[in-house]
């Protein structure tokens, strides 16, 4: 079993709310219990190992995918519900409780994050964390401090193993 709670280095000042380190079991349970999840993927998901696992996660619970950056081509012909959206715009929309969502059925209660640059996604999640009730679960390689919950900093091999554990638990 991969310890996904290790190496959560906090580079923040006193009083700042940061994400909780989570295990693969907790991540899978939260994803399974989400009423309106959205899988937000970045360009890093084009790595073949990550892309394969992203597709498996989306298919396991029929989770729609918000493909950001240049990640959309990876989901063509993969039989998943993927739509392109700009990451910054998505962050703005998620803070609006009246946003109809990518499918017109309302805003999301939980976002799952994979394949993003740490410095970029942290800025977007700062707004989501402070101005909405949307929970964010980062299953990325790096600890994302502005997510609600996040894996710790993992090696590539540990990250792939952790994603496989999440898939098995979904």
Curated annotation (Swiss-Prot):
Family matches, as Pfam families: CO_dh
Keyword Transmembrane: no
Gene3D superfamilies linked to this entry: TPP-binding domain
Key words, A-Z: Methanogenesis
BP terms from Gene Ontology: methanogenesis, from acetate
Keyword Metal-binding attached: no
GO molecular function, one term: anaerobic carbon-monoxide dehydrogenase activity
Transmembrane segments: none
Pathway(s) it belongs to: One-carbon metabolism; methanogenesis from acetate
InterPro entries found in the cross-reference section: CdhB, DHS-like_NAD/FAD-binding_dom
The protein's role, per its UniProt record: Part of a complex that catalyzes the reversible cleavage of acetyl-CoA, allowing growth on acetate as sole source of carbon and energy. The alpha-epsilon subcomponent functions as a carbon monoxide dehydrogenase. The precise role of the epsilon subunit is unclear; it may have a stabilizing role within the alpha(2)epsilon(2) component and/or be involved in electron transfer to FAD during a potential FAD-mediated CO oxidation.
Family per similarity comment: Belongs to the CdhB family.
Subunit structure: Heterotetramer of two alpha and two epsilon subunits. The ACDS complex is made up of alpha, epsilon, beta, gamma and delta subunits with a probable stoichiometry of (alpha(2)epsilon(2))(4)-beta(8)-(gamma(1)delta(1))(8).
Protein name in the entry: Acetyl-CoA decarbonylase/synthase complex subunit epsilon 2
Higher taxonomy: Archaea, Methanobacteriati, Methanobacteriota, Stenosarchaea group, Methanomicrobia
Gene: cdhB2
């Amino acid at each position: 079993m991969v310890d996904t709670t290790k190496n959560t280095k906090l580079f923040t000042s006193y009083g700042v709310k940061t994400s909780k380190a989570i295990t693969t079991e907790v991540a899978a349970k939260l994803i399974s219990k989400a009423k309106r999840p959205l899988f937000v993927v970045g360009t890093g998901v084009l790595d073949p190992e990550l892309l394969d696992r992203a597709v498996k996660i989306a298919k396991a619970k029929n989770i729609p995918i918000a493909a950001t950056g240049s990640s959309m081509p990876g989901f063509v012909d993969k039989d998943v519900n993927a739509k392109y959206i700009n990451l910054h715009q998505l962050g703005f929309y998620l803070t609006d409780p009246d946003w109809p969502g990518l499918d017109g059925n309302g805003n999301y209660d939980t976002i799952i994050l994979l394949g993003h640059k740490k410095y970029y996604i942290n800025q977007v999640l700062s707004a989501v964390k402070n101005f909405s009730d949307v929970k964010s679960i980062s299953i990325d390689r790096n600890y994302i401090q502005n997510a609600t919950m996040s894996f710790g900093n993992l090696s590539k091999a540990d990250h792939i193993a952790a994603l496989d554990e999440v898939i098995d638990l979904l």
